[in-house]
Amino acid sequence: MNTQGTGYDMATSTVEADTRAHIVAVADELFYARGIQSVGMDEIRTGAGVSLKKLYAAFPGKEQLVAAVLTGRHEYWEHGIEQAVAAAATPRDRLLAMYDFLEQWFSDDTFRGCGFINAFGELGSTSPTVARIAREHKESFQEYVAGLAAEVVPDRVAAEELAAQLALLAEGAQTTAAIAGDSAPATHARRAAATLIDAATRA
């Protein structure tokens, strides 16, 4: 999957890497549970157990911290999807394994939907950085699915169309599961994906 350079480059900070990572983890938990705009930097400072000076040395502004959180979520998503796909035996099963990952994720008590959609909903209209990161994350996933689809459908155009359909199922399942508080949308999406894959291979 494409590990594009989205987000904030933490290598430019003078604060220790472990401290930055801890701040990001605390911010991620708070942002994801309650929303970005409802959580202030002072609350993050308290949660991380660092001084306000150190917090701002690590992340000069909240937008940079949000970018770092989203970059971490992108990496987590990539790892989870790739791990599930790697365990599958056939090209068809590799496509369907994405939905197995979603079902496991949806079953987690902390699941609150797609962090990128959530962030875009809050800040996409006012933060070009957040909008770009969210867009690049979705484009990266689309490209990854297209690569998997090409193993099932040799025709490039047909593979890209199948990938667009399967990615849309995954995106819709995330939103539906978050609202319903239920992992069943992953199962429904997997069944629909199987139907689409089988239809594409018969064409």
Where in the sequence are the language-model features?
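All-alpha amphipathic helical-bundle segments outside canonical DNA-binding/catalytic cores
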Residues: 132-133, 150-167, 184, 188
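Amphipathic alpha-helical segments used for helix-helix packing
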Residues: 108-129
